[in-house]
Amino acid sequence: MFRRPSARSAPAGPSEGAGRLDLAPFRRLLGYTRPYAWRLVLALVASSIGSLLFLAFPVVVGDLFNNAFGAGSTRALTGWAVDLFGGSAGEGIGGTTPADLNAIALVLIAVFALNAATTYVRVYQLGHVGEGVVADLRRELFRHLLGLSTRFFETRPTGEITSRLTSDIATIQAAVSNVLVQLVSQSVSLVGGVVVLFVINARLTLVMLAVLPAVIVAAAVFGRRLRKISTAFQDELAAANARAEEAISGIRVVQSFTAERHEADRYGEAIRTAFASALRRARVRALFVPSVFTGFLMGIGLVLWYGGRLALAGDLPPGDLITFLLLTVTVAGSIGAFTGLYSQVQEAAGASRRVFELLDARSDLPEPARPTALDAVRGEVRFEGVRFRYGDRGDAWVLDGIDLVANPGEVVALVGPSGAGKSTLVTLVPRFFDPVEGRVTLDGVDLRELDPHDLRHHVGVVPQETLLFSGSIAENVRYGRPNASDEEVVAAAVAANADAFVREFPDGYGTLVGERGVKLSGGQRQRIAIARALLKDPRILVLDEATSSLDSESEALVQVALERLMEGRTTFVIAHRLSTVVDADRIVVLDAGRIVQVGRHAELLAEGGLYRDLYEIQFRDVDA
């Protein structure tokens, strides 16, 4: 199946490590900031300077009050301004002049201006880093997903995958762009604030710090609970998105069975489950915020009570009490920011684990370290003792002992009852799966020894249900060869019998086909797919019941285009219509995963057996 990440690098599951903070995902996330390292450093420096300036504000305000009321001398921080701007316009209380107050006010203005400048630098640079990291992570995740095997996408709902690309990575963005800088800036504010508080009054500082242990314990308890609930919420929201994706992509089936209410109820139930988790998360936050805030208020209340007693006793100037109060609020804010960061980290932990789980997923189709080069491909495809089963669908063999050779340029038709293994057999040709036993070769080389991209460059597939992308007709044809010229696109459409109907549209080849080609008919979509395959010009062609869902008129046009497409190419046709079977070089009859008959149409009819039974059931009316 899929190789899981190693124990050392794998992120924890939803319950694993739920009682502790796992920093491994965040160390890994920091690796994505390397291309923006100088911007991150600049943001860190600006944030540190801003934090120091914010610490200067209470000190300057305290000096302003002490000087205004003659309660103390000017501190070194504002002394240079008093010396520079101070005058003798008249003596005030305690020898302080109005010019001294003016100088201190100028310091305040300078602090505010510098703080505004550092805030601008920090916010802009962090925004650049955060958006850049998220864009890089989304690109890497999407590119990685495209390289995984078909089996991966069969076991993962599309909505779940898109949820990882959108909501989970958005949750990570705040952690990447904010946590590190906030950690540094709040550390500067906390440590610097506590140091200044000790300088002002050590006893009062100890009283204030007595409240901290209770606040930290509360943050840890609530943070652990919040992490569990947030992980569950993200999982439930992804499940809801998966259901919505299914219903929207199959809207015609939903409406044809009048199942709108059923799908709405299914999605509504999934949303109600996610909503219940969201409410649990809201309740935890609602308890967490006031609990921590109450602890802060208790600390501030203690400072006011004890500091007021010191001021009344003359042991603490009133300006210093104001400075102490402002710094206490700053320290409390820093502690609150740390608890908020802890919650943010806890919420992002679940999202980052899920994203990295996808990034760590490995395809069950390993690429060779030194792939064999494909030069001139002749197109001989050989199945040697091939046995295959899906594993997750039971232990029965879907293909059992297949030995088959398709010579270069030969058309091989595959027929048999439903579930015989026809579609599974052709999926082995472009190596969407590997056989469990035996091997498949191209020109004598095991497909597992080839680069999958190189192999698939030489294989073209036209399925029964054609998927077009929501662009123009020209873009969909050019999908077979992106660098093709407009003339080559038109030539491929002409060969596919598509040019005539394309030119009937007002916008011609610029006509938008809609999501999955919904604006075109089935026959038109099929001819666009054939033009796409013609432009790719593969050596090997796989036609998976390419005309079975078309009406007679569309089938005739598509059949002519297919005959042009098959010229000179090794072709596997899962046959459903008589015309394709009659013209095949060989017809291979499958039943229960085994080859039971091989031959041309007339030979198999004369031989009898399963093929003639299928012919009599399916083809007699057409032949008549």
In which residue ranges do the predicted regions lie?
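A short amphipathic helical element positioned immediately N-terminal to and/or at the very start
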Residues: 22-37, 161
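Transmembrane helix-loop-helix hairpins at lipid-water interfaces of multipass membrane proteins
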Residues: 40-117, 198-203, 301, 305, ...
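Transmembrane helices of ABC transporter permease
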Residues: 39-52, 181-232, 303-316, 333
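ABC-type nucleotide-binding domain
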Residues: 374-624
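Short intracellular "coupling" helices and adjacent cytoplasmic loop segments at the cytosolic face
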Residues: 8-19, 69-73, 131, 139-163, ...
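An intracellular "coupling" helix at the cytosolic face of ABC transporter transmembrane type-1 domains
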Residues: 30, 34, 150-151, 167-176, ...
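Helix-loop-helix
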Residues: 196-210, 280, 284-353, 358-359
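Juxtamembrane helix-loop junctions of ABC transporter transmembrane domains
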Residues: 14-22, 45-46, 53-69, 107-158, ...
